[in-house]
UniProtKB/Swiss-Prot annotation:
GO CC annotations, alphabetized: cytoplasm; plasma membrane
Pathway recorded for this protein: Amino-acid degradation; D-alanine degradation; NH(3) and pyruvate from D-alanine: step 1/1
HAMAP family: DadA
Cofactor requirements of the protein: FAD
UniProt family annotation: Belongs to the DadA oxidoreductase family.
Gene name tied to this protein: dadA
Protein's name in the database: D-amino acid dehydrogenase
Protein keywords: FAD, Flavoprotein, Oxidoreductase
Provenance organism: Paraburkholderia phymatum (strain DSM 17167 / CIP 108236 / LMG 21445 / STM815) (Burkholderia phymatum)
Group of enzyme by EC: oxidoreductase
């Protein structure tokens, strides 16, 4: 079958690769000049299935109020003047219960664990290189309350059979030797030895090249205007004066998916603004060896070959992509506090991107009420972590194969109430 994939970020490119490997004729369309030039360009770099968890969690509403008065707050909110933002935040609040958190985290871990398995198989099959490391990830706690609170996450990890280690301050240097100098600031850590790291932009670029070898056509610098309906199905996508036709269509447009699908399928995907800096390593012994996550500031610090990537934070501010110096200062403070002398932050590049977030944290992957329209979006801060599994899952669905994991609760239908064949929008 002919399949058009809209979007060439890591989610779009993995979708195209797995579709091509399944024997489909695939075309990828993107407005940018190449793959992974927006949200996938400079993310935090961790592939963390075990840490897959929704931002909508018990206690977050109260924390959000406190964060409003903190200089280095991990979350910031500014009204963007749209009703959609208010609706999205309200639905996110409804997911901040213990019961909803457990359900949402459970399905996120399910997809993320499967995705890591798919990535490992892909790496073994192709030999793709992307400055990846398989040294696990380490979540660091600065307070006793954070350490005690890890018990809830550990329960979910045990239920999903995810290996873990709960480390005391004296043990942290076993996982990250450079923390020997700063472990006195910490109360402990949760290590997941099965997690990985890597440069998402490098991976996406090289996977796109592999996809081309399988026959995938990439059309860059191409406007994506609208989907055209004929007889209850998608007939094609309007790209300027051209209509590109296919049998099936995949929307992998990240935060822009919601507006693009307006009037066709209503999805609650909102841009969650994040920041990163990338600093050259000046002392390898003082730098991390894998990924460290600072629970207090919600910041990830990741080691690439000769660089340190520091990324995180979340701003609910719409499509504002301005770089804020205060956010850079927070990222620099965090990495210099934990790994002083490891990298030269004065020479770091500064970046921001918009992560496509759903109010429950789970991405939207799968079928829609339109028979030949499929979605692969809404991965939030876990697009890199979940990309391969989402791409394989989508390829299986389009190919008519039974997916390797439960997938019904990952589709858009969890937001849609269907009665007598009629679909009610998520916010009707």
């Amino acid at each position: 079958m002919r399949v058009v994939v809209l979007g060439s970020g890591v989610v779009g490119v993995t979708s195209a690769y797995y579709l091509a490997r399944a024997g489909h004729e695939v075309t990828v369309i993107d407005r940018e000049a190449g793959p992974a030039l927006e949200t996938s360009f400079a993310n935090a770099g961790q592939i963390s299935p075990g840490y897959a968890a929704p931002w909508a969690a018990p206690g977050v509403p109260l924390k959000a109020v406190k964060w409003m008065f903190q200089k280095h707050a991990p979350l910031a909110i500014r009204l963007d003047g749209t009703q959609f933002q208010l609706q999205w935040m309200w639905q996110m609040l409804q997911n901040c219960t213990s019961a909803r958190y457990a359900v949402n985290k459970g399905r996120m871990v399910r997809l993320a664990e499967y995705s890591r398995d798919c990535l490992q198989a892909l790496r073994a099959e192709t030999g793709i290189q992307y400055e990846g490391r398989t040294g696990g990830t380490l979540q660091l706690f600065r307070t006793q309350q954070q350490l005690d609170g890890a018990a809830k996450d550990i329960a979910v990890l045990e239920e999903a059979n995810v290996p873990y280690e709960l480390l005391m301050p004296a043990d942290l240097a076993r996982a990250e030797p450079a923390l020997a100098a700063t472990s006195h600031k910490l109360t402990g850590g949760l290590r997941l030895p099965g997690d990985e790291t890597g440069d998402c932009q490098l991976f996406t670029t090289r996977l796109a090249a592999l996809a081309e070898q399988l026959g995938v056509k990439f059309r860059y610098n191409t406007p994506i205007d609208a989907l055209a309906m004929e007889g209850g199905r998608i007939a094609g996508v309007k790209c300027g004066n051209e209509m590109v036709r296919a049998d099936n269509f995949v929307v992998a447009l990240g935060s822009y998916s919601t507006q693009f699908l307006s009037g066709l399928v209503k999805i609650p995907v909102y841009p969650l603004k994040g920041y990163s800096i990338t600093a050259p390593i000046v002392d390898a012994k003082s730098a991390p060896v894998s990924t460290v996550l600072d629970e207090t500031y919600k910041i990830a610090i990741t080691r690439f070959d000769d660089r340190i990537r520091v990324g995180g934070m979340a701003e609910i501010v719409g499509f504002d992509k301005k770089l804020k110096q205060a956010r850079r200062e927070t990222l620099e403070m965090c990495v210099n506090d934990l790994f002083p002398g490891g990298g030269d932050t004065s020479k770091a590049t500064f970046w921001t991107g918009l992560r496509p977030m759903t109010p429950d944290g789970t991405p939207i992957v799968g079928r829609t009420p339109v028979s030949n329209l499929f979605l692969n979006t809404g991965h939030g801060t876990l697009g890199w972590t979940m990309s391969c599994g989402s791409g394989q899952l989508l390829a299986d669905l389009i190919s008519g194969k039974r997916p390797a994991i439960q997938s019904g609760d990952l589709s858009v239908h969890r937001y849609l109430g269907e009665t007598a064949g009629q679909t009610r929008p998520a916010y009707a």
